[in-house]
Structure formats: C-alpha cells, structure tokens
C-alpha cells in the first residue's frame, strides 16, 4: 500500500457516502475484472435444495369454487372465520379467495373437510 495503513483505509471508506461507495465498488470491479454480486449456490443434479425438503407447517386455505350449495358454504365461512353474514357472502361471491391464512396443517385439513362436505372445492397452499 502506498502510504495508507489498513486502519486509515477503513476509516477513509467508512466516511464515504453511499454514492461514493457505489462508485468505488464499480471502479474496483473494472480494475480487477470481478463482480461484487454474490455467487448463486450450485445445486447438484439429482438433489433438491434443503429448503424444498422441509415440510410446510402453515397453510393458506383458499376457497376455489362454491358448488351448488352457496348458503351452506357461507355458513361454513362464517363458522371458520367468524365473519358476519355480508362479509362471508362477499367472500364466497368473490371466489377463488383466501379464507384463512397461516393455519396449522391439521386445522387446514379440518377446514378443507368442512368445505368439501358442503360441496365446495378448497385448495391448501
């Protein structure tokens, strides 16, 4: 280094503005022919990323189609969500809509069962 210690260089960099730091990074990229972007992790063929192997614990319950028994579906929506009659009817009329978000798997399955019993289709995401 030409006259600057590491501490002096760090102090100089820490006093720069964001724009100056951005220009410094660009200049260093050009000077050394590198990129400051983080490299993407390589996935070996035949294996899936660790995130995909974890089992999902929370689900969104989405009402797909109402079927023929709209009144019974509205009743189930009210039971599951605690909504008033008008809000539940609006939700059913606007299907496909999310009925409940971030529920446990067992609860989501139970809600799905209630809807399928009255003829509605439900999707868990």
From Swiss-Prot:
It comes from the Bacteria. Homodimer. Part of the ribosomal stalk of the 50S ribosomal subunit. Forms a multimeric L10(L12)X complex, where L10 forms an elongated spine to which 2 to 4 L12 dimers bind in a sequential fashion. Binds GTP-bound translation factors. The lineage of its organism: Bacteria, Pseudomonadati, Elusimicrobiota, Endomicrobiia, Endomicrobiales. GO terms for biological process: translation. Disulfide bonds: none annotated. Belongs to the bacterial ribosomal protein bL12 family. One of its GO terms (molecular function) is structural constituent of ribosome. The keyword ATP-binding does not apply. GO terms for cellular component: cytosolic large ribosomal subunit. Gene3D superfamilies: 3.30.1390.10, Single helix bin. This is Large ribosomal subunit protein bL12. The keyword rRNA processing does not apply. Keywords: Ribonucleoprotein, Ribosomal protein.
């Amino acid at each position: 280094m030409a006259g600057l210690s590491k501490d002096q260089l760090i102090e100089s960099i820490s006093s720069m503005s964001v724009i100056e730091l951005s220009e410094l990074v660009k200049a260093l990229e050009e000077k050394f022919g590198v990129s400051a972007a983080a490299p993407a992790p390589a996935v070996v063929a035949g294996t899936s990323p660790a995130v995909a192997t974890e089992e999902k614990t929370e689900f969104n319950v989405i009402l797909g189609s109402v079927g023929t028994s709209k009144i019974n579906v509205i009743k189930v929506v009210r039971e599951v969500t605690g909504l008033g009659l008008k809000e539940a009817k609006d939700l059913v009329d606007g299907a496909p809509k999310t009925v409940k978000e971030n529920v446990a798997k067992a609860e989501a399955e139970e809600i799905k069962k209630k809807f399928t019993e009255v003829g509605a289709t439900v999707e868990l995401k």
